Amino acid sequence: MGQSVSAIRRVSRLRRHARLRKRIAGTQQRPRLVVHRSARHIHVQLVNDANGTTVAAASSIETDVRGLDGDKKARSVRVGQLIAERAKAADIDTVVFDRGGYTYGGRIAALADAARENGLKF
């Protein structure tokens, strides 16, 4: 017997993320925009890998995002807007996008597009 399909997909995603992390790293001027997607929520952080700190974060668990009507993609758009606002407050305008091994589509693309529309460059 082999592994379940969901276990294989998870391991494959983690391998993709490990390959991606070999090539990218965040700095003070250009932090890494890290995305984590679960079945229900989406989380995003700006990480400075030089000293291992989180500069800013946003999530669909926050109360102003939870109250939104609509689907998960609409919440992802709002999270993208929030992280762009918080990055501006921290004087950050350019980031390195780390999609976490997830395919660039759906909620991940919606979050990235919303962050770009609100002033983040990547």
From Swiss-Prot:
Pfam families per UniProt: Ribosomal_L18p
Keyword Signal found:
no
GO terms under biological process: translation
Q: Which InterPro entries match?
A: Ribosomal_uL18_bac-type, Ribosomal_uL18_bac/euk
Q: Which PANTHER family match?
A: 39S RIBOSOMAL PROTEIN L18, MITOCHONDRIAL, LARGE RIBOSOMAL SUBUNIT PROTEIN UL18M
Family classification:
Belongs to the universal ribosomal protein uL18 family.
Q: What HAMAP family does the entry give?
A: Ribosomal_uL18_B
Q: Could you describe the subunit structure of this protein? A: Part of the 50S ribosomal subunit; part of the 5S rRNA/L5/L18/L25 subcomplex. Contacts the 5S and 23S rRNAs.
What is the protein's known function?
A: This is one of the proteins that bind and probably mediate the attachment of the 5S RNA into the large ribosomal subunit, where it forms part of the central protuberance.
Name listed for the protein in its UniProt record? Large ribosomal subunit protein uL18
Q: Which organism is it from?
A: Mycobacterium ulcerans (strain Agy99)
Q: Which gene encodes it?
A: rplR
